[in-house]
Amino acid sequence: MNIAFFLIPKHEVVYLAVNGTMRQALEKMEFHRYTAVPLIDEQGKYAGTLTEGDLLWQMKNTGLTFANTAKIRIKDIPRRMINTPVRVNAEMEDLFSLAIVQNFVPVVDDSDIFIGIIRRREIIEYYAKRFCVNK
């Protein structure tokens, strides 16, 4: 089954600009209660995923305080997790192995422009329904 049916479009996704600040990331992730968010570059392309762990390690390893996180650019924060994106024409079967290690799967078009995400929840629900039907 094509993934477009399960896509949460970009305008409904909480994401961060890669040139934003660490403070913006902390505040947005806290407000929405997310542990990971997609990063988008100036051209609208998917640029990776920022996690709470990335932020915590940055603070621990550099001695930052909350007050000076506004000086740190997101693009300068090392990321320890790679959320592999898929193209919009992918099939659900392509997402199963990614969902094991990713909270969400970023979806891009043929020009690598970020168009949305598919959450792990939707992938699990899809396979749960298939499993119940095939029982």
Predicted feature locations:
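A glycine-centered beta-loop-beta connector
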Residues: 29, 37-54, 99, 107-122
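A short, polar/charged loop-to-alpha-helix boundary motif
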Residues: 54-69, 123-135
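Short, flexible segments with low predicted structural confidence
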Residues: 1, 10, 26-28, 48-49, ...
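Bateman (tandem CBS) regulatory domains
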Residues: 1-13, 70-82
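The conserved cystathionine-beta-synthase
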Residues: 15-33, 40, 84-102, 108-110, ...
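Regulatory sensory and allosteric helical modules in signal-transduction proteins
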Residues: 61, 79, 84-86
